[in-house]
Amino acid sequence: MYWIYNVLLIFYWIGLIPVILYRLAFEDGFYERIKQSAGYMPASLLKKIEGRRAIWIHAASVGEIVATSPLVKEVKKEFPEAVVVVSVVTATGHAMAHRIIPEAEGIIFFPLDLPYLTRKILHIIKPITILLVETEIWPNFLRIAQSEDIPVMMVNGRISDRSMKRYKYISAFTKEMLRSIERFCMQSKFDAAHIEVLGAHTPDITVTGNMKYDQTY
């Protein structure tokens, strides 16, 4: 299944080349965004992570970033010596992260989910663990993290009815991806039941509530 996914992904990005070129020409900040997504990290971040343990937290957009803020605070309390790197997908999420997560040493754009780029960035950041906020399931990222023996946890996990139907279309692939995640901390019993049906091991699932309610900014 992974080779099919990768072929489709390559064609997808080839199709987006005209859009990318247009945005590079006319959209402020897009060059830095695509540069980071291609594996080129800011020099300031490279200095901060050199020789230190890193915890990577991925939160796609604004909603996930709101939930990530209290999580980062707790991580810094428990592991004050660790570098916290927060990755996002959207420009609005990036701006929000800078505004409400000052504790993070690095805020970056998530890499394109291509095997070479994913492996490259994992080797640069060298995270001791990865926390995925809500339902950020990226096949190559999970597979390569597992191959590098990097533990991955889903936090504030949520599986809507709509997502459930979508994942069921690729049930075998979904199950394989979920087996790359060691722990599932879900928002509700409803979400826990959904993730279990999709293939997560029951002993690895915990209901922890919604972290967005812990936000104090």
Language model features with spans:
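Active-site and donor-binding regions of nucleotide-sugar-utilizing enzymes
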Residues: 17-217
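Membrane-interacting alpha-helical segments
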Residues: 1-8, 12-22
